[in-house]
Amino acid sequence: MSNLFKDMLKDSESLFKNPIALDYDYQPKLIPYRDNEQHYIASCIKPLLQDRNGKNLFIFGKPGIGKTVATKHVLQDLEENEGEIQQIYINCWKKDTPYKVVLEICEQVGYKWTQQKKTDELFQKAKEILNKTSTIFVLDEVDKLQDTSIIYSIVEDIYKKTILLITNEKDWINTIDNRLISRLIPEFLEFKPYNQEETKGILKQRVQYAFNQNVFEEKAFNQIAEKTFELQDIRTGLFLLKESALIAENKSLKKIKLEYSEEAIKKLATFTPKDKKHLQEDEKQILALIKDNSGKSIKDLYGIYSLNNNLAYRTFQKKIKQLETAKQITLKDHKDGWGYYKTVELGNLKTLKDY
């Protein structure tokens, strides 16, 4: 007699072995297809091992193609083999002012007496600690900094260092002061998108880390790999792997079928790689305003926002641009009798037909 329940999950069973392996910040033991980039990053750090000043590096490329994870892998390798070099990692999306950056540096070097001290005072204390050794500074999402003076301070006042600037925005380097560029003298490293074979290989590696054996039907996995390559963002693929597995688990099934990957792809219309918890309070307020007024122009939105908030129009425009970069909103260009203007809509404008 056939077992009608052999393909059903029991209460204690799960498709997942290690779901953390599908998180965007997860650090795999091996970073495939980025050996050349990691060696280049390491070469900029190498002079620090010889008690000399390191090279500064501007790292750029599209979102979700391994810039941060490859950099962190190099730092992890350095920590395991050369633990005497101080490492400072700052995400400038979260720490976007000189004060916030310096406060984070103080925390990472173990200086705790930060209350009622100004930015310059805090940096002076951090400098005294950092100049006793060599330091690697990683400023991730550096384009989110509201003020680049902190980079200038690091360049001028920290003796032996390597500064790694990471951004999705290739042209950001052209927006900073020439005086800073002349002191940074950065080298440039572009992370190019993964090709189709590499994309499939990365997702296959994550499947091995995250799931029990043989849970994905080949057609379902291939469809996810194809969609990920099309969108050129590995984070999208991780979302699809996780979502399709959750759909199968909700049905108590042991196999992830093509229909579940298709259902997961439909959910991409509401998916944003940048979690809203990373937004600042004013950005959350602006996002809530857009939700209630989707389709209005930036000028009209500012008119509503400024009724209860004190924020310059130029700063408001910058916040709108940051939300667009984070894929929380979409800007659309329009033209009327008075010229060009932009309207703002919530989330990703792609419809299910686009998928």
Question: Which residues make up each language-model segment?
Answer:
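Terminal-proximal interaction/regulatory segments of ATP-powered molecular machines
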Residues: 296-355
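Walker A/P-loop nucleotide-binding motif
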Residues: 51-73
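A short, basic N-terminal segment
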Residues: 1-54
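Conserved C-terminal helix/linker of AAA+ ATPases
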Residues: 247-272
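AAA+ ATPase "lid" subdomain C-terminal helix
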Residues: 229-234, 242-256, 291-292, 309, ...
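Conserved catalytic segments around the Walker B and adjacent sensor/switch elements
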Residues: 56-58, 80-94, 187
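Short amphipathic alpha-helical interface segments
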Residues: 280-303
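Mid-core helix/loop region of P-loop NTP-binding domains shared across ATPases and GTPases
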Residues: 9-16, 21-23, 71, 75, ...
